[in-house]
């Protein structure tokens, strides 16, 4: 009978673990964006980037209209705590005009661009942005893209390399008057 008890205990442990992991996922739901998320998205962006670099509410309205399905939003309860967004294109390099021109999105494009990776300050250093980046990578892979492209500042090159992005050199982008590095993940 001892053997059976052990098995039952194990089953109970698994059940408990399942419930805990479900709660965790429920606690931090990840989903795509609709226009109802506009206020929250713009507020998180404003909290994460200086004005010269932050996308405006009007720009996000356009982005959500054209590629809301290429936003990955993470919530803590009802609160938006982090998001990643970017459109899809056949262009191989990320250019400044892409940020402002959401209509350049091409749903059947080869490359998933990443325009923004934002986590509000109080929720940083928990790996939430990383989870969203992994979601974006996973979705791009499922959708048959060639890969993903992003630009980042010097101190983040190493961070994105951990996800499989390779450094391609200094980007032509002068977004916000800052130097950006282009990184690419190829499938």
Task: Give the predicted meaning of each segment.
Residues 133, 140-152:
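Conserved GNAT acetyl-CoA-binding A-motif
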Residues 106-108, 120-134, 143, 157-158, ...:
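Conserved glycine-rich acetyl-CoA-binding loop
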Residues 51-77, 81-104:
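Active-site rim helix/loop that mediates acceptor-substrate recognition in acyltransferases
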Residues 83-118, 124, 134, 173-179:
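Conserved acyl-donor/pantetheine-binding loop and adjacent beta-alpha core of acyl/acetyltransferases
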Residues 1-3, 17, 21:
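Short, Lys/Arg-enriched N-terminal segments with co-localized hydrophobic residues
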Residues 27-41:
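A short beta-loop-alpha structural element at the N-terminal edge
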Residues 13, 88-91, 151, 161, ...:
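Conserved catalytic-core motifs of GNAT/GCN5-like acyltransferases
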